[in-house]
Structure formats: structure tokens, C-alpha cells
Amino acid sequence: MSLLQKIPRKVWRFLDIINRLIKKDKESIFIYSNLGFRDNIKAIFDYLIENKYNSEFRITVSLNNYEEYEKTYQNLNIPNIKFVSNLKGVFSFFRCKYCFYCFGKYPIKPAPGQVVFNLWHGMPLKRIGNMVKGCEKVNYNYFTHLLCTSEFFRDIMKKSFNCSDNEIVICGQPRTDNMLNSQAPVKEREIKARIISFNERKNKMILWLPTFREKSADEFDILSKEQLESLNQMCINRKYTVVIKPHPLSSFKAEDFNDYKGIKIITDQRLDSLGINFYSVIRYSECLITDYS
């Protein structure tokens, strides 16, 4: 449990009052995540930088792993960008006019005139939020806007977060822009050379995204060791490569697959170190294997 999660609700209620009292800076943007710098908040950040919003706005990024990015972006000499811890981020949240998150949140009610956008991280195929049994009375609404990808999900998201029609914004997920962008900066063979190998860069890529399970032993239980070996050999013979990206909360060990030439493991950390957007990988895969999460 993080330090922020240990703070009693009574303290957060006091911070609601503090947030209402502090004047907001109209030239500041705040981005928050407690599960790494990725997904919709990374897509929003990249868009802001690519379109030079940082020339008009000061952008603060609050992350659980902010140290990994602080020096990197300092070396890039991008102006008006600051990375802080989630604890220090509270003070930036108080001052910022525009706020975005998709993982975690500060359970602080937005101040009048403050824009807090919950981008979430996908449309639910299972119960979430207030629709989960036993969570009907939990307050998940700490935003002014909630992203919803279509009218089909409007009522589901409203019930899940106990919000109104006025708070729903129908829009695509920012993260998928890279998957659909025909002008994607990283080309297919370059991506394959980085995440598979240079020699196998012409292979067709099958992307496997297993869902998160409470028991790590269950994540790949659909294939026995013998079946994995058979799949590996089939891929080698047919010039395919199966790329498995585990769920970010997964605890399985990538080194268990080192002996399989036709099966590769890629993690969010590895993609980040290679400078590859995950949705570019989806764009260039021949086939996607997954289940709902």
C-alpha cells in the first residue's frame, strides 16, 4: 500500500476544502499516474509536446516512478516540463487548471472552474466501480469529465462512476491514435528489429496479450510446456514470431521464455526503454490473441 493510500478519508475531505481555496493557474497542466508513464496519459503528454503546448503551458507529470523520466527529459532540454512524485504532485494538483489521469487518482473533488479529466484505460467488459458487488456506495467520482468511447458505453460508465450525462465525453482513446496513424514515426521492420531481432525483422508477428490473473501460475495455463515447445517450433518453421506482453501487474518471469526462439516477451518497461509505443506494435501485428480483462 502506498503512502497516499494510507491517508484517512477525513484528511482528503480537508484537502477538498484546500483545493477550493487555492487559485488555479490557467497556464498549467497536471498529469497523474500511479501505475507508470504509459497508456492514455502518456498519449496525452506526447500530443502536448508534439504540438508545442509546453510553449504556452507549464506541464507537471506526477508518477510513482518519476525518477526514471526526470533526468531523461532534462537531457532533452524540453522547456516547461517537470516530473514529481505522487506525494509532491498533490501541491501541483491544487494549483493546476487542467488535470488528466487514467490510473489511480487523488480523491480530491475538483474546485469550481478546475477541469479534471478521467481518461480511464479502456471500456469495461466486466463490472467496474460502483457496479461491482459491495462497491455500490464507494465514491469514484473525482472528476469533471469522463472519457467514453461510444454511446453504447454511456450508461455503463455513468453507473460505474456515478456521474451525469454532462460529465461524459464521447471520444476515442488517445492511446489508439498511434495504432491508427498512417504517419507513425517508427516503421514496421524497425519495430520488429528492436523487439524481436534484426534477423527476424521480416517475420510475421503474432501479439499475445494474456489478461491479469490473481494467481501468476494461471497466466499461461492454456499451454503446457510441450505445447509451448510445439508452438515455438511451428513459428520458426513458418517464419512467425509470437510476442507476449504480460499485464503490467503480472509477476511472471520473462527469463522462463529465453529458450524459445519463436516466442518473445516484451514488457512496458522494455518498450519504454526502446522508445516504442505499444500501439505501434499492435498496428504491425498480423494477429492479436487476448481475452477480456
Descriptions of predicted regions:
Residues 15-25, 108-109, 194-200:
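Short boundary motifs at domain starts and secondary-structure transition points
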Residues 83-96, 248-293:
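Donor nucleotide-activated moiety binding/catalytic core segment of transferases
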Residues 96-101, 182-190, 278-283:
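Short, surface-exposed amphipathic charged segments that create phosphate/polyanion-binding patches used
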Residues 21-30, 113-114, 201-204, 238:
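A short, charged/proline- and glycine-enriched loop
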Residues 37-44, 50-52, 175-259:
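Conserved catalytic-core segment of nucleotide-activated headgroup transferases in glycan assembly
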